[in-house]
């Protein structure tokens, strides 16, 4: 009588382990991708901090939104939603000066990594903080997020 329930339980457990449980290799791969994202965000922040022209600095005061809580990879959906406005602001700023990096390539790489890390789940809705942040603050907060993911 209990044999069927036991077999069902074992089958379900095996299915969950095979399909859903993270393995050490997937965790390592995730950490490598987060490390890549961290490096790209730091490069972007460095580039923004190199702007010396006051007009460019004013452009970088454009306001962005941060989620109320950013602790899991699914919260990268919130970063993904802010990438296009950030790229637009940086492209305008870059057109006013001669910068050493290609913003478009860097933003494409960041976007690709974010989409890979957050997965195809699109039902997650970001809850944004009411307080807005500058581009520098946005990048600093996401850099901190990446560092916390790597350290766990």
UniProtKB/Swiss-Prot annotation:
GO cellular component: extracellular space
Coiled-coil intervals: none
PROSITE patterns linked to this entry: INTERLEUKIN_2
Pfam families, A to Z: IL2 (PF00715)
SUPFAM superfamilies associated with the record: 4-helical cytokines
Signal peptide: 1-20
Residues bearing attached sugar chains per UniProt: 23
Localization: Secreted
Superkingdom to which the source organism belongs: Eukaryota
Family matches, as InterPro entries: 4_helix_cytokine-like_core, IL-2, IL-2_CS
Record key words, sorted: Adaptive immunity, Cytokine, Disulfide bond, Glycoprotein, Growth factor, Immunity, Secreted, Signal
GO biological process, one term: adaptive immune response
Single GO molecular function: interleukin-2 receptor binding
Cystine connections: 78-126
Function statement: Cytokine produced by activated CD4-positive helper T-cells and to a lesser extend activated CD8-positive T-cells and natural killer (NK) cells that plays pivotal roles in the immune response and tolerance. Binds to a receptor complex composed of either the high-affinity trimeric IL-2R (IL2RA/CD25, IL2RB/CD122 and IL2RG/CD132) or the low-affinity dimeric IL-2R (IL2RB and IL2RG). Interaction with the receptor leads to oligomerization and conformation changes in the IL-2R subunits resulting in downstream signaling starting with phosphorylation of JAK1 and JAK3.
Family to which the UniProt record says this protein belongs: Belongs to the IL-2 family.
Name this polypeptide is given: Interleukin-2
